Amino acid sequence: MNPGGEQTIMEQPAQQQQQQQQQQQQQQQQAAVPQQPLDPLTQSTAETWLSIASLAETLGDGDRAAMAYDATLQFNPSSAKALTSLAHLYRSRDMFQRAAELYERALLVNPELSDVWATLGHCYLMLDDLQRAYNAYQQALYHLSNPNVPKLWHGIGILYDRYGSLDYAEEAFAKVLELDPHFEKANEIYFRLGIIYKHQGKWSQALECFRYILPQPPAPLQEWDIWFQLGSVLESMGEWQGAKEAYEHVLAQNQHHAKVLQQLGCLYGMSNVQFYDPQKALDYLLKSLEADPSDATTWYHLGRVHMIRTDYTAAYDAFQQAVNRDSRNPIFWCSIGVLYYQISQYRDALDAYTRAIRLNPYISEVWYDLGTLYETCNNQLSDALDAYKQAARLDVNNVHIRERLEALTKQLENPGNINKSNGAPTNASPAPPPVILQPTLQPNDQGNPLNTRISAQSANATASMVQQQHPAQQTPINSSATMYSNGASPQLQAQAQAQAQAQAQAQAQAQAQAQAQAQAQAQAQAQAQAQAQAQAHAQAQAQAQAQAQAQAQAQAQQQQQQQQQQQQQQQQQQQQQQQQQQQQQQQLQPLPRQQLQQKGVSVQMLNPQQGQPYITQPTVIQAHQLQPFSTQAMEHPQSSQLPPQQQQLQSVQHPQQLQGQPQAQAPQPLIQHNVEQNVLPQKRYMEGAIHTLVDAAVSSSTHTENNTKSPRQPTHAIPTQAPATGITNAEPQVKKQKLNSPNSNINKLVNTATSIEENAKSEVSNQSPAVVESNTNNTSQEEKPVKANSIPSVIGAQEPPQEASPAEEATKAASVSPSTKPLNTEPESSSVQPTVSSESSTTKANDQSTAETIELSTATVPAEASPVEDEVRQHSKEENGTTEASAPSTEEAEPAASRDAEKQQDETAATTITVIKPTLETMETVKEEAKMREEEQTSQEKSPQENTLPRENVVRQVEEDENYDD
């Protein structure tokens, strides 16, 4: 070869990079100038360390050699030999980045080192920095006096192979083998040439290359890699049996080779081979997916095997997996169209074929399948003919396409035979073509995967292969470059430069985009941080507010608790004061011996704890007294909020309740009612021989008062307030009562009592069970006060004793809500029955009948009793003087209310119209009882607890009235 020709060819690329070289040289000189002066001692020390490093490297001690080279560079940083030798050590250990840095430093010291430029290009090639590798190789060719260096061309061939310029790579590798047939990397070069020939379709040359290196494969590769390449080439040549045997050799050495399993599955799934076995094909493909589930080609072949086995659902799933991994593969979409065609989904098949044609319009099988679809679906023969013609143009040698095109052309030329021939082609064409023509796409599938497998699987292999290339770089070979003599080098260089520039631009754009993305991300992060901080501040503020609210609530709760405690303390103090007052009054008014003997029950009445049957009731009363200001004060206005019927009942039965009355004295009547319950049994035992109406009246009134003390009173705080007003208004009213009508009221009371005695016997049997029922149903009557009041038979039998005894019922009615009367009736009968057990049934009947008539007379007209009571109480007070002035006002007010009520009943005839004359027994009984009541009155007139107990005093008033009449 002409060296002059080589120089003329090299002039053009040299001229293009002269300026760059000059700039680099200037920089190198500037960098080298300050490092030149070294004192002799330093220089000699550096040389000594360099000698030590060379000796260690000769002995094979790389670590000590590297340490010595580092020491040399400390004393002489510009030692080119130390830099290059240390770089060679790093490159031998695959430390290409560190080696490249040292090579660059050596080139700054001496840019004329062509061998260093070549090795630097190889380092950049291993680092996948193709642009810098290309520039380094250019500098090596420029500085070399003889460019015929096999290692240099070996590196250039790898560079072109990485670029994808297979023709230039083939020329570079061929030049290496021409320069040195026994090149140390010859087997690697043959392997690379075999791959290049396979991609170029040069099957025989590829087989020669692979068979040549089969006994001794390149260092990073193994024998089964060569067998795999042989099988791939044989399969591409159509030698199915040889390909199967080659793949089986691979499986003998590597049972988990995913690509080999994939290819074997594809071979066993082909219907035109002798060893056709869909089940084996399925097994091999499933094993391949176990080894590498990310391979889209394996999923594609699996789908085709499922189609052969008519498992269309599994085939669809497999094709879906393949498309998910490689959505731009037209072969996948063609097979999906065939699947839709076989399950008669023609519209979907048309969409799949259309997409495959858009991705690659140069696949003949897709056009053939599209023609079959047109011909079968809607008998679109003209469209089918166009599709067949396009398929025939793309694949002239395809027999199926040519036969189908000829048959369809004959049909169109003979329109009369279209109907006859229409059935045959349509029946024959749809099934075979999609299945038969698809295997022809396999070579296209199997061309590129090998390169990708080698580049991905043997990255370290290529590095090791390149490492073995460079030790021989120092041995120049004097030979001519055939590539330059043929004139291929300028074109190669121009293309390489264009590609390098394009890559540089792409890299610059990518870097700019990366920077922009980084900035955008930084801004987004800053915004996110700001938002997070704002949210944190907001949360902190919300927490602070919540804490403040919680503290405020806690303080409010504490204040409420303190207020409640204060109220409770006040209530306790008031109760203590009341108890002290009661004790003082008891001490100031000692009873005489006769009164204590006759009325020992009244003493027990003030101390209810002495009587065992009544121990529990005072405790209940005290429990209700703990909240006199809260519950009763709140319940007072609730009486006006009741339904109209209940309000009418309240106004009729309790006329005095509508007048404003204080609430502080509410607990008093509860205790006093308890007291009178204890009075009744002892009266019966003291006067067991007397069967009078007064005893029945007293017993019923005491039971009524006991019922007012029942749990219904806490729910109605208003009734407990009425006795307080009765205390203040009773004394002037008693005198008026006696002055106005002393005789008429007594006569009416006695007449009524005698009439009830006659009718009592017939009613006793009916009244007692009613009373028992009312006792058992106390809770239900408490909830329904209106109903209980609407039953006159039961109420009349139970409530009259309150008013048959002196007219206490007028004021008691004001102190008892509508819901308390049914309760009064229930315990009345229950308490009367055990206390009167020693008496005869006649006494019970008289008592109950008297109570019944008096209750009816007083309950109907209570509203008009208040003015009459005032007059009667005033007259009675004048006559009785000192004795009656000290008596409780409520005890004197109730007889007046009963008399006035009876008077008005006679006038209006609303409830009962009975006029019966009194008997002698009744008159005597009234007199005796009046004496007893007078004695009790003197002992209880000043005590606050007895202000609401008018039963016995009323009896005494009745006796006094009778004596006055006599």
Swiss-Prot record:
It comes from the Eukaryota. One of its GO terms (molecular function) is transcription corepressor activity. It is found in: Nucleus. One of its GO terms (biological process) is mitotic cell cycle. Its main location: nucleus. Keywords: Amyloid, Nucleus, Phosphoprotein, Prion, Repeat, Repressor, TPR repeat, Transcription, Transcription regulation. The modification Phosphothreonine is found at residue 475. [OCT+] is the prion form of CYC8. [OCT+] is the result of a conformational change of the cellular CYC8 protein that becomes self-propagating and infectious. [OCT+]-aggregates sequester soluble CYC8, resulting in increased levels of iso-2-cytochrome c, defects in sporulation and mating, higher levels of invertase derepression and increased flocculation, reminiscent of a partial loss of function of the CYC8-TUP1 corepressor complex. [OCT+] can be cured by GdnHCl and by inactivation of the molecular chaperone HSP104, which is required for [OCT+] propagation. Present with 3890 molecules/cell in log phase SD medium. The prion domain (PrD) is a Gln/Asn (Q/N)-rich domain, which is unstructured in its native, soluble form, and which forms a parallel in-register beta-sheet in its amyloid form. Associates with TUP1 to form the CYC8-TUP1 (or TUP1-SSN6) corepressor complex that is composed of 4 copies of TUP1 and one copy of CYC8. Interacts with MATALPHA2, CTI6, MIG1, TUP1, SUT1, RFX1, PGD1, HOS1, HOS2 and RPD3. This is General transcriptional corepressor CYC8. It comes from Saccharomyces cerevisiae (strain ATCC 204508 / S288c). The lineage of its organism: Eukaryota, Fungi, Dikarya, Ascomycota, Saccharomycotina.
